[in-house]
Amino acid sequence: MAVSSCQSIMSNSMTNISSRSRVNQFTNIPSVYIPTLRRNVSLKVRSMAEGEPKEQSKVAVDPTTPTASTPTPQPAYTRPPKMSTKFSDLMAFSGPAPERINGRLAMIGFVAAMGVEIAKGQGLSEQLSGGGVAWFLGTSVLLSLASLIPFFQGVSVESKSKSIMSSDAEFWNGRIAMLGLVALAFTEFVKGTSLV
């Protein structure tokens, strides 16, 4: 609609402009339908202030000394608060570490569980009972410490985020892997055998 009206305006040449005063020159619509902008000549503006206007006292200001009434300029850019490196802050319920660590462990655990299940045909419960608990605990401690070291140095996950390997992608992949592990365990429990 807007394109066609612009094209019709542009296609009309200046020679086709009519000299009629009751018709809009560009759209050929009678001016009865288009609101006009008329000036109200009788409009007067007056002040509603009470009393006499007060004159400001003139005080000589020395240009070398700053006045007390001038505000101090605030910097335009303020740094974000630095991330806390205390263990209790990192591992708090809303801290940066717990969900990252659990997500990373779930990603490794889901891939490892599915790999063993495809290769050997063992379910998740068989993997844990056949010596998998020691591997699980060792891997969990190692990856948890490896995830905590950058946090203790004050490095946030978002500062090291890149376009493809972004922190949001890791966050969502970890959540999906956690759901995948729970779904794998639940499916094997209901089914009674391994998934594959």
Swiss-Prot record:
The chain crosses the membrane at residues 105-125, 132-152, 176-196. Residues 1-48 form a transit peptide. Keywords: Chloroplast, Membrane, Plastid, Transit peptide, Transmembrane, Transmembrane helix. Induction: By light. GO terms for cellular component: chloroplast membrane. Its main location: plastid. Residues 47-57 have a biased composition (Basic and acidic residues). Residues 47-81 are annotated as: Disordered. It is a multi-pass membrane protein. Belongs to the ELIP/psbS family. Probably involved in the integration of pigments into the mature pigment-protein complexes. This is Early light-induced protein, chloroplastic. It comes from Pisum sativum (Garden pea).
